Amino acid sequence: MGQIQFQGAITALVTPFKKGEIDLECYREIIEWQIEQGINGLVSCGTTGESATLTYEEYKLLIKACVEQTKSRVPVIAGAGSNDTAKAIQLTKIAKELGADGVLHVTPYYNKPTQEGLFQHFKTIASQESIPILLYNVPGRTGCNLLPETVARIVQDIPEVVGIKDATGNLEQFSEIIEFCPIGFQVLTGDDFTILPSMILGGCGVISVISNIVPAMVVELCSLIEKNKLEEARQIHYNLAPLCRLMFVETNPIPVKTALSLMEKLELEFRLPLTELSPINFTKLESTLKNIGIISK
């Protein structure tokens, strides 16, 4: 474990739909564009990919397409999380069989497990399938918080766990994960607003929503921070700030898919209970995309 490096700018891919079905041709085109733009890795079937409303067959189609299209040019991470440990194991098995380089496991949502329950959940998954695991902590969606002390315990006892996507937006907690865990443990932010400060603290990159829209800018931001060119990095951070804010003006991935439709990268379609962006927020998003030159005025 640990040979694969999950670092830099990694895009949490959207899932394009067309008349209720997955648009695989569009998905492959998006993946190819991401790689052409220099992205460092891809997450398929994560939160941004509307994983909650995918069937097993659709999950297989998407992971298979992502692995095939990347052709090992960048690492592929498969979202495999569930609040049902047995289902999480099943998804992990599928991802491994289809050739994913790693799996992303969100903390179980709704059940509200204790820290011991979280530890046992990840330990059980790792005991069944040997594949690099990234933990995923996003309390705003799950209703539970994976504490830094628990992360450190997991890393010590479960060698399959090679990193974490921390989407708390809490820099103190992010810092403690780095402090408590061994050197080489890969700590990525899942919050586009905190790419700059989190990497200065020692994080190794981001699993990003905004890189669906501006992959090259996010790649450059991460690269500049790694090279300690902080003044240039700050400029990109502030250039991206208005767009970052709009990505969460309504539930992810509603704004990002809307932006991609305005860029003519996909047809705008969601699965319920997600619905289209409100008219007022659509106008704000369209205006911002025009102002920063992503779409023509």
Curated annotation (Swiss-Prot):
Keywords: Amino-acid biosynthesis, Cytoplasm, Diaminopimelate biosynthesis, Lyase, Lysine biosynthesis, Schiff base. The keyword DNA-binding does not apply. It is an enzyme of class 4 (lyase). The active site is at Y136, K165. PANTHER family: 4-HYDROXY-2-OXOGLUTARATE ALDOLASE, MITOCHONDRIAL (PTHR12128:SF66), DIHYDRODIPICOLINATE SYNTHASE (PTHR12128). HAMAP family: DapA. GO terms for molecular function: 4-hydroxy-tetrahydrodipicolinate synthase activity. Catalyzes the condensation of (S)-aspartate-beta-semialdehyde [(S)-ASA] and pyruvate to 4-hydroxy-tetrahydrodipicolinate (HTPA). Homotetramer; dimer of dimers. The keyword Amino-acid biosynthesis applies. InterPro entries: Aldolase_TIM (IPR013785), DapA (IPR005263), DapA-like (IPR002220), Schiff_base-form_aldolases_AS (IPR020625), Schiff_base-form_aldolases_CS (IPR020624). CDD domains: DHDPS (cd00950). Pfam families: DHDPS (PF00701). It comes from the Bacteria. It catalyses: L-aspartate 4-semialdehyde + pyruvate = (2S,4S)-4-hydroxy-2,3,4,5-tetrahydrodipicolinate + H2O + H(+). This is 4-hydroxy-tetrahydrodipicolinate synthase. Its EC number is 4.3.3.7. Pyruvate binds at T48, I207. It is found in: Cytoplasm. Its main location: cytoplasm. The record marks T47, Y110 as: Part of a proton relay during catalysis. Pathway: Amino-acid biosynthesis; L-lysine biosynthesis via DAP pathway; (S)-tetrahydrodipicolinate from L-aspartate: step 3/4. NCBIfam families: dapA. GO terms for biological process: diaminopimelate biosynthetic process; lysine biosynthetic process via diaminopimelate. Belongs to the DapA family. One of its GO terms (cellular component) is cytosol.
